[in-house]
């Protein structure tokens, strides 16, 4: 029982920090050169820049001490990424698009849970 509580508290603590937001934003912005080539199943350039940039802004809000608004921003833009790219990335069955979709799902769930607990 104690191990389950430890994992739960770790999951809650990691999504009360800005690290996942910066990591996902950085991964999306780093994938812009790849998005110019338009790989099958991969994200497109405006989606990378918008979702990555706003996740970084959400991380900045969390780093500034505004956990509620920062986690709300990260949740909204992670869900936006999923709405735009989830279906085609899963259908492509390629590693990089599926990894980004998994990262977006984890951020949406983690920061969404944090937002609901704070709000």
Swiss-Prot record:
Location within or outside the cell: Mitochondrion membrane
Main location: mitochondrion
Signal peptide positions on this chain: none
Topology within the bilayer: Multi-pass membrane protein
GO biological processes: heme biosynthetic process
Keywords: Membrane, Mitochondrion, Transmembrane, Transmembrane helix
Gene Ontology CC entries for this record: mitochondrial membrane; mitochondrion
Residues annotated as transmembrane: 13-32, 42-64, 69-86, 93-112
PANTHER family the record matches: ALTERED INHERITANCE OF MITOCHONDRIA PROTEIN 19, MITOCHONDRIAL (PTHR28177:SF1)
Family: Belongs to the AIM19 family.
Protein name per Swiss-Prot or TrEMBL: Altered inheritance of mitochondria protein 19 homolog
């Amino acid at each position: 029982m104690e191990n389950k509580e430890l994992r739960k508290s770790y999951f809650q603590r990691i999504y009360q920090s800005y690290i996942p937001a910066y990591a996902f934003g950085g991964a999306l912005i780093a994938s812009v050169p790849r998005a110019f080539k338009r790989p099958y199943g991969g994200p497109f350039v405006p989606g990378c820049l918008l979702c990555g940039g706003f996740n970084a802004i959400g991380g900045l809000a969390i780093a500034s001490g505004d956990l509620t608004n920062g986690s709300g921003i990260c949740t909204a833009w992670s869900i936006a990424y999923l709405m735009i790219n989830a279906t085609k990335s899963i259908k492509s069955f390629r590693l990089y698009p599926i990894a980004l979709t998994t990262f977006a799902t984890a951020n949406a769930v983690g920061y969404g849970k944090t937002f609901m607990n704070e709000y």
